[in-house]
Amino acid sequence: GAILPLEQLLQQVLQRYPGSKLLEAELEEKHDVYVYEVELLTSAGIVREIKLDASDGRLLKDEEDD
């Protein structure tokens, strides 16, 4: 199926963590499911790993990255 543009989903993620910086973003595909994996450095200095469903923008994972 179609996937949403990364830029659109990044805005959603950056609104969740204002003042954060994007470290890395990549599109992954497993079993015909596309997932954006995004790493952010929050304003508090914490790295967060966020996974979004690329087809509908659903948040799949949001946790501190060690």
PLM regions with names:
Residues G57-D66:
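Short, low-complexity, Pro/Ser/Thr/Gly-rich segments in the mature regions of secreted, periplasmic
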